[in-house]
């Protein structure tokens, strides 16, 4: 375990110590050492909290093999790979092991008991007992054999293992794993030919590995460990190493930080300042806070700033010592004693705080407590008091004699007596305080001087044993510290003359250690003959196995840190008890109970034999094993204790890439509490801050000088973790110098070659972006690295090094060239490092084509045809001189996924917005959002909270801060959260379980934390129990174990993945693979080589979901050449960090399960894949129907316009961002209308199409080309319509009509000039039936998307509505309205709706109506008309598009122009979102290009506006057709439904039980446009009383979001009746208009009333009824008469709606 909390403390104090590493960023290492026990625990019991978890041995072994493979692959050691499993530990360690195993057995037992008490059914198989990971058990013996098999297999089959020496020190070799590794390192260092620049990497989880690594005094030493997360909710550990984030902790930086920590000593000490000796003393100080061998000193805790205290004391006392304390592992006792004496002041300071509290306590309760406490010590302390008093008086008299004032002398004497009394009392209490500690903790009766002297000697002896163990290895196997607690610092004295001597002894045998450390609960791990010793009452050692025991936190906070109070084993008694049983051991058991040597293995091609499988049913034998062995004796690596030399590190040596140093940039350092965030929270202690020193006066900082020194050159960035990069631009915020190169060029310009550069001056926007970049970089350096970079004068833009690639010259020479990322990243100039001598070991032996493509080597084709095919190089001697290679390619059969791509929406999980769930469940959208996230409940009440503990009772299905979602339950689309039916069912179940919790949170939505007693205030209600019940239910629910994924991850759902697997299986059955022999140019071949790892094979390839790919990486978990399909894409900030989830065609060892069959999935970077589909697209020139997803930065939460999701945006009658996709097959009528509308679209696009590039969502090249093709196909330049439009005199005129004056002028002009173009437009709709039928047979082009039948119907009506809106007033206004109303059909099911050609007369009437001149007083009913110059309807161009129409209509009604934004869908479609200033938000369907999406979205917006009319009312109730998620009667109302009627005529009893308080005055219909006076009501010149008009003098409209209330049982029960009535009422809706002389009243037949009550918005009504409502000021609609329609005549409401003030629920 090492040192608790040490790793976190050290990482936060020195923020640059660790870095998160990706595989391509790992530096080169010579030696890799694995402390295996961490891996074994990780793979065998990843989640101890799950009592249902079971795992088989073969799964454990396979996972361990895979973990080892990945670690080897990540580090790629060049010389040595050392695997060390813990063997028998020294006796000093066994006590800690014993306590840990007793605790884990008891915890497991308690968890099982709790599960059984809850009624859980546990699996019948035995659970994995983690105590079996102890030397000598059957499990460890099996693992040992399997690890030997694994090493042989890898050496024989994996090229990357064949040049490395492998050491395997198993559980049979005595010693802890990490100390066996250190023994090897010490022996290597002792050799005369040792290379001081050897690069070491040690993998392990123990914090004390930092100290171990520093004892080596090696310059290049790093620690690899898994990412440790602190402070968050405990999550299940991930077994797969691919999913694991690794940290690399650099001891090179640790050494420099320690130097800074003690640099003040350079000026204070008289002897030589030696950083190596300072590091030795630093290691010694680390032991004083406790470790595996000794307990911590009293009250000295890391999280209570113990280490700064130790360091500060050292800085104070070292100048007085005359030398260092730790002399290469030997303790200098006189110096150590002086240090401890100085440190013991802490004991008194700590007690003084306690003493002050006691004095206060005494003042409250009298002297009784102190008198009793001091009783025993009073007598002993009397002499001490007298001595101290006399001494104090002498000192006082000396001082007071100097003063001649007698009065002052008397006063001083009085004060002296008071102070002396206080000091005496303090010392008495201090001694009694320590006495109580020893009596209670150590169980002694008399705390004598001999006892204290023994304590001191034991502690110092322990420190010396540990120093030997770390520096020289085990000096005594049998020594151990015999107490559970350490003595007080102030009691460790008189130690300078101690004689410390250790007897080496012998290590325990495996079974002896098992019996010494295992509890009785794990007795089955021992041979049967020993088991009775742990359980039989007559056993001579039964007292060492207590069934129950106590633990003592002893000042610690976590239970796992507590002292386990079990007796120490008496070695002699243990061995005597075992002696009587040894004769019963079986032969196999005797073999397990012995020590064995370490194995050294290496590859020998001349050695070949069959290695048998340790488990033939699971693992195959190795047919051609090429491994040689050497046995290393147990003491071969022991170094003489006096020969342990310290390596002197050459400070002027070359910089080794990947081993960071702080030396390259001038800076100063200081300690400050800056809250640097290394882990999940800001640090609370001091941070070692680094401040970069910049000479502001220097000419070097001018942008011209910076550009001339770095542009086009290689520099190192990201100080102090330097990475090489190529500079492509430099800017100072005003001017920018950049390389002017042909596309694809990535050349370094060295020497006198001047790079081709260009200078530009930045505009305001670019200058603002530059400032933001600088601010972002500065904040990152400060918040994460603790580096202050100060003022920035220049920013360098560079491409990071991704790897090296073989390039072939024209003459056939082969060079290994650096490859740079396409992505350009900004770095501030003062953090880059130039002109450093870096050591580069990546030399290549490959010089010619023959070297690069040897006979029978594997290659991949990067040209067409046969793109991505695997090939084998043949003899090319006759063609290689011509620069060609002969290859035989295998061409396998490929599955056809086109049909699946087209129909993917049928298999995708459907997600809905939160308010749809809210409607179905009968709760508010706020509750849906809150309960699917986190909800914290504290103990007690808000007024009287009980402690700081808070329980999270949220479902945890979405994580905004972490940008994570739970696939299958939640999905983030842009900035909106969507929910599946599974999430809905989970919420419904929660609502049924805890309705009172929902009710309370709905009423108190403004609070962040809720309290038990406030939610359940009743005396009989136990809030704590209720919270515990909820937590138990949540933990037991399967959703609690589901994994989260990043919202940036685009995925295909499991159902689609299953269909892909089916297609692949069908393809396999065809088996028509063929082979072809071709000669290929070498640059079109890719050969997998280790030197090329990290390089993308084909940089032009673009990756999409459904793409077919092949793995081209050798010595990888995935077999080279295996094909698969991309089923997920995880974006990242860097190109190299993008990961693809691939479903492979075959199962393979180490394969993951990613929504697919077991063992067929894996996550790979771009550099490991060749995209087969990209080759197909290149060959055919066709673009795929799925989304093009180039490796791109992860989408930030705020950039909704470029957000990527896997949802499917549908079309019409659905909520904004609804994921509904129409699946109905278009009918013949649909096609007829579609053809008409597309012909109109095509003929109207060219004039207004202006390709624009969105700032956040750049148009992809493919999309632009598609758009251009689409426009070209619309019409020919020579067509009549085109010529007519080209010469349209009104085009330029329209451009000028933007100012109010021009608008008024255009109004006059429009009344004079007739519009002849509209006649042609309407005549074009007159198409014969025969042509329609004929055209329907030809079909649509494949790239065009079919609209749903609803779209066609709505589109037709919308077309008519557009025309109607264009001319909305005439001289005889009422007659026109009546005429139009009669012409537009009411039933949406009639054939005439689609059959436009069958209504030629009607079209002409509409045309004549449209061409009538319009008067300026058309909008005289609109208020504040005098304050505005209204734009008049000007001449309509011959043919307009929906976008231009929408813009024109917005101008007509005084609204700003519509706002268009785009959403990129995962299957390559684009969706446009239209937002109007009146609050209307409309989404179009999925389209292939942005322009098409924009047009169709505008079309849908026009439908909405056309249906709404001028005074836009609220939109329709979206959820009327959704069924309730919960069956009737399951959700009780949160409040009893009140009786009575509201003043709108609604029956309260039939309404909802309001979770959110209703506002009765807000239930009225809200206008979307200018408000209209209503007779009999007070008229306000705003939307409603109390609101202010919007800018511009007229309110653009308001749409208040409605909040659904809880559905009552009664309403749910009547659901079916409402649906029946709704279905009947939608058949037909007769409408009558009033006489000209009477008020316009809409009359609805009785059959319609129930439907009307369900559809709160007029959208669902026929268009004619809206025109009637859109009356002039003189003919206003009477609200009194129409009230019965919407309120009093309906029987009941399906959904109660609260039109409160708009409040976003997400």
UniProtKB/Swiss-Prot annotation:
Biological process (GO) annotations held by this record are: cellular response to cycloheximide; cellular response to puromycin; histone mRNA catabolic process; negative regulation of telomere maintenance via telomerase; negative regulation of translation; nuclear mRNA surveillance; nuclear-transcribed mRNA catabolic process; response to testosterone
- Biased composition range(s): Low complexity: 1647-1657
- Which superkingdom heads the taxonomic lineage of this protein's source? Eukaryota
Pfam families linked: SH3_12, XRN1_D1, XRN1_D2_D3, XRN_M, XRN_N
Chief place where the protein resides:
cytoplasm
Amino acid composition bias (Basic residues), ranges on this chain: 1677-1694
Give expression by tissue.
Expressed in heart, brain, pancreas, spleen, testis, osteogenic sarcoma (OGS) biopsy and primary cell lines.
Family membership: Belongs to the 5'-3' exonuclease family.
* Protein name, as recorded: 5'-3' exoribonuclease 1
Q: What is the organism field in this record?
A: Homo sapiens (Human)
């Amino acid at each position: 375990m090492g040192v608790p909390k040490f790793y976190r403390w050290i990482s936060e104090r020195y923020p640059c110590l660790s870095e998160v590493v990706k595989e391509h960023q790992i530096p080169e290492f010579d030696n890799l050492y694995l402390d295996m026990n961490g891996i074994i625990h990780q793979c065998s019991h990843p989640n101890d909290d799950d009592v249902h978890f079971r795992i088989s041995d073969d799964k454990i072994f396979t996972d361990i093999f895979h973990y080892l493979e990945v670690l080897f692959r990540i580090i790629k050691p060049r010389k040595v790979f050392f695997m060390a499993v813990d063997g028998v530990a020294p006796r000093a360690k066994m006590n800690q092991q014993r306590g840990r195993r007793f605790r884990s057995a008891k915890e497991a037992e308690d968890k099982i008991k709790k599960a059984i008490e809850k009624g859980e059914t546990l699996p019948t198989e035995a659970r994995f007992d983690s105590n079996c990971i102890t030397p000598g058990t059957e499990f460890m013996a099996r693992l040992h054999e399997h690890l030997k098999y694994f090493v042989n297999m890898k050496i024989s089959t994996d090229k990357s293992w064949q040049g490395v020496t492998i050491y395997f020190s198993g559980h049979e070799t005595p010693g802890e794993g990490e100390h066996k590794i250190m023994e090897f390192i010490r022996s290597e260092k002792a050799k005369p030919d040792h290379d001081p620049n050897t690069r070491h990497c040690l993998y392990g989880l123990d914090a004390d590995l930092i100290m171990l690594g520093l004892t080596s005094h090696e310059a290049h030493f790093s620690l690899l460990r898994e990412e440790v997360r602190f402070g968050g909710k405990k999550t299940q550990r991930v077994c797969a190493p691919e999913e694991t984030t690794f940290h690399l902790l650099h001891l090179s930086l640790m050494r420099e930080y320690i130097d800074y920590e003690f640099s003040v000593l350079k000026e204070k000490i008289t002897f030589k300042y030696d950083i190596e000796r300072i590091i030795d003393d630093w290691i010694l100080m680390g032991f004083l806070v406790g470790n595996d061998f000794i307990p911590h000193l009293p009250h000295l805790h890391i999280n209570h700033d113990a280490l700064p205290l130790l360091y500060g004391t050292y800085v104070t006392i070292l100048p007085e010592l005359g030398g260092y304390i730790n002399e290469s592992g030997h303790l200098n006792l006189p110096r150590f004693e002086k240090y401890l004496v100085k440190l013991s002041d802490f004991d008194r300071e700590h007690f003084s705080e306690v003493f002050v509290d006691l004095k206060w306590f005494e003042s409250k309760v009298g002297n009784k407590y102190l008198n009793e406490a001091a009783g025993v010590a009073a007598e002993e302390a009397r002499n001490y008091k007298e001595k101290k008093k006399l001494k104090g008086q002498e000192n006082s008299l000396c001082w007071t004699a100097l003063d001649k004032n007698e009065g002052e002398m008397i006063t001083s004497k009085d004060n002296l007596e008071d102070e002396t009394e206080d000091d005496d009392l303090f010392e008495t209490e201090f001694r009694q305080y320590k006495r109580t500690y020893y009596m209670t903790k150590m169980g002694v009766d008399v705390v004598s001087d001999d006892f204290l002297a023994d304590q001191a000697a034991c502690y110092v002896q322990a420190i010396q044993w540990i120093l030997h163990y770390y520096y020289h290895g085990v000096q005594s196997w049998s020594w151990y510290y015999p107490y559970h607690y350490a003595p007080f610092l102030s009691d460790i004295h008189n130690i300078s003359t101690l004689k410390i001597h250790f007897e080496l002894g012998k290590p325990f045998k495996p079974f002896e250690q098992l019996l010494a450390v295992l509890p009785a609960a794990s007795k089955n791990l021992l041979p049967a003959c020993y088991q009775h010793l742990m359980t039989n009452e007559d056993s001579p050692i039964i007292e060492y196995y207590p069934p129950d025991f106590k633990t003592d936190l002893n000042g610690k906070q976590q239970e796992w840190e507590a002292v386990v109070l079990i007796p120490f084993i008496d070695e002699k008694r243990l061995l005597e008890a075992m002696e009587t049983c040894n004769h019963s051991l079986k032969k196999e058991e005797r073999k397990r109970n012995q020590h064995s040597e370490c194995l050294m293995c290496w590859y020998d091609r001349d050695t070949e034999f069959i290695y048998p499988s340790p488990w033939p049913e699971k693992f195959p034998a190795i047919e051609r094993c090429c491994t040689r062995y050497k046995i290393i004796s147990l003491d071969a690596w022991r170094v003489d204790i006096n020969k342990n030399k310290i390596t002197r590190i050459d400070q002027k040596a070359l910089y080794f890439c990947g081993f960071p140093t702080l030396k390259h940039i001038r800076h100063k350092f200081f300690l400050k509490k800056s809250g640097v965030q290394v882990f999940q929270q800001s640090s609370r202690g001091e941070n070692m801050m680094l401040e970069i020193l910049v000479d502001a006066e220097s000419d070097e900082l001018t942008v011209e000088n910076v550009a001339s020194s770095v542009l086009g050159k290689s520099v190192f960035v990201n100080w102090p973790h330097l990475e090489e990069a190529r500079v492509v631009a430099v800017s100072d915020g005003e001017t920018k110098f950049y390389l002017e190169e042909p596309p694809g060029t990535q050349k370094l310009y060295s020497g006198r070659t001047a790079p081709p550069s260009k200078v530009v001056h930045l505009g305001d926007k670019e200058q603002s972006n530059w400032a933001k970049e600088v601010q972002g970089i500065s904040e990152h350096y400060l918040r994460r690295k603790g580096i202050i970079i100060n003022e920035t004068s220049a920013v360098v833009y560079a491409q990071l090094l991704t790897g090296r690639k073989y390039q072939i010259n024209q003459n056939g020479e082969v060079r290994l060239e650096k490859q740079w990322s396409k992505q350009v990243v900004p770095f501030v100039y003062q953090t880059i490092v130039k002109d450093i001598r870096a050591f580069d070991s990546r030399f290549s032996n490959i010089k010619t084509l023959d070297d690069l493509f040897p006979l029978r080597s594997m290659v991949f084709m990067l040209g067409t045809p046969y793109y991505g095919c695997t090939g084998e190089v043949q003899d090319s001697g006759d063609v290689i001189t011509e620069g060609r290679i002969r290859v035989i390619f295998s061409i396998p059969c490929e599955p056809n996924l086109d049909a699946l791509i087209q129909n993917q929406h049928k298999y995708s999980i459907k997600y809905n917005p939160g308010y749809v769930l809210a409607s179905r469940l009968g709760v508010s959208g706020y509750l849906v959002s809150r309960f699917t996230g986190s909800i914290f409940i504290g103990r007690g009440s808000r007024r009287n909270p009980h402690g700081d503990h808070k329980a999270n009772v949220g479902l945890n299905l979405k994580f905004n801060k972490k940008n994570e979602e739970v696939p299958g339950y939640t999905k983030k689309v842009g900035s909106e959260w969507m929910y599946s039916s599974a999430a809905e069912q989970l919420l419904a179940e929660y609502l049924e379980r805890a309705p009172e919790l929902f009710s309370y949170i709905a009423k108190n939505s403004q609070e962040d934390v809720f309290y038990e007693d406030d939610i359940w205030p009743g005396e009989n209600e136990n809030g704590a129990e209720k919270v515990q019940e909820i937590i138990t239910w949540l933990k037991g629910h399967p959703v609690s174990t589901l994994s989260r994924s990043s919202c940036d991850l685009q995925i295909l759902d499991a159902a689609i993945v299953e269909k892909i697997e089916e297609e692949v299986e069908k393809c396999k059955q065809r088996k028509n693979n063929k082979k072809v022999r071709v000669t290929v140019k070498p640059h079109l071949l890719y050969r997998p080589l280790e030197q090329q790892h990290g390089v993308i094979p084909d940089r032009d390839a673009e990756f999409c979901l459904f793409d077919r790919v092949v793995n081209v990486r050798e010595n990888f978990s995935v077999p080279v050449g295996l094909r698969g399909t991309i089923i997920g894409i995880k974006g990242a900030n860097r190109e190299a960090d993008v990961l693809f989830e691939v479903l492979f065609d075959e199962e393979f060892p180490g394969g993951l399960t990613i929504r697919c069959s077991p063992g067929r999935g894996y996550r790979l970077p771009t550099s490991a894949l060749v995209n087969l589909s990209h080759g197909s697209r290149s060959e055919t020139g066709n673009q795929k129907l799925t989304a093009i997803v180039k490796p791109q930065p992860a989408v930030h939460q705020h950039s909704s316009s470029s957000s990527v999701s896997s949802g499917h945006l549908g079309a019409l009658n659905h909520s904004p961002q609804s994921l509904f996709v129409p699946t109905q097959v278009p009918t013949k009528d649909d096609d007829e209308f579609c053809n008409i509308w597309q012909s109109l679209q095509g003929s109207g696009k060219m004039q207004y199409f202006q390709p624009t590039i969105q700032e956040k969502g750049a148009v992809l090249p493919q999309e632009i080309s598609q758009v251009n093709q689409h426009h070209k196909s619309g019409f020919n330049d020579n067509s009549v319509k085109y010529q007519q439009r080209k010469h349209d005199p009104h085009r330029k005129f329209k451009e000028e009509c933007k100012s109010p004056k021009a608008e008024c002028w255009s109004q006059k002009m429009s009344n004079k000039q007739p519009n002849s173009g509209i006649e042609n437009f309407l005549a074009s709709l007159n198409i014969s039936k025969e042509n329609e039928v004929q055209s329907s047979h030809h079909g649509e082009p494949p790239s065009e998307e079919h609209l749903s039948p609803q779209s066609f119907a709505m589109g037709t009506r919308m077309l008519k509505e557009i025309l109607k809106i264009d001319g909305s007033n005439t001289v005889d206004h009422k007659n026109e309205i009546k005429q139009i109303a009669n012409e537009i059909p009411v039933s949406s099911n009639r054939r005439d709706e689609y059959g436009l050609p069958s209504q030629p007369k009607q079209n002409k009437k509409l045309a004549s109506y449209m061409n009538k001149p319009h008067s300026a007083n058309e909008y005289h009913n609109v208020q504040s008309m005098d304050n505005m110059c209204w734009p008049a309807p000007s001449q309509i161009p011959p043919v307009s598009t929906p976008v231009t129409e929408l813009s024109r209509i917005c101008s007509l009604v005084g609204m700003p122009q519509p706002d268009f934004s785009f959403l990129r869908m995962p299957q390559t479609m684009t969706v446009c979102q239209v937002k109007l200033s009146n609050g209307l938000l409309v989404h179009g369907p999925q389209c292939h290009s942005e322009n098409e999406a924009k047009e169709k979205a505008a079309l849908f917006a026009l439908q909405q506006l056309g249906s709404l009319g001028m005074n836009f009312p609220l939109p329709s109730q979206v959820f009327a057709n959704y069924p309730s998620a919960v069956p009737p009667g399951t959700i009780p109302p949160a409040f009893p439904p009140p009786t009575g009627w509201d003043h709108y005529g609604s029956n309260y009893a039939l309404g909802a039980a309001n979770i959110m308080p209703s506002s009765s005055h807000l239930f009225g219909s809200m206008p979307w446009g200018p408000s209209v006076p209503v007779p009999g009501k007070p008229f306000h010149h705003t939307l409603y009383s109390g609101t202010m008009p919007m800018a511009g003098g007229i309110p653009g409209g308001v749409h208040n979001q409605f909040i659904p209330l809880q559905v009552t049982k009664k309403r749910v029960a009547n659901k079916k009746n409402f649906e029946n009535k709704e279905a009947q009422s939608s058949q037909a809706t007769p409408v009558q208009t009033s006489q000209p002389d009477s008020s316009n009243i809409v009359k609805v037949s009785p059959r319609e009333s129930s439907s009307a009550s369900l559809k709160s918005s007029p959208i669902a009504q026929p268009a004619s009824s809206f025109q009637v409502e859109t009356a002039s000021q003189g003919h206003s609609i009477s609200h009194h008469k129409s009230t019965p329609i919407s309120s009093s005549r309906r029987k009941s409401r399906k959904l109660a709606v609260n039109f409160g003030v708009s409040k976003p629920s997400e």
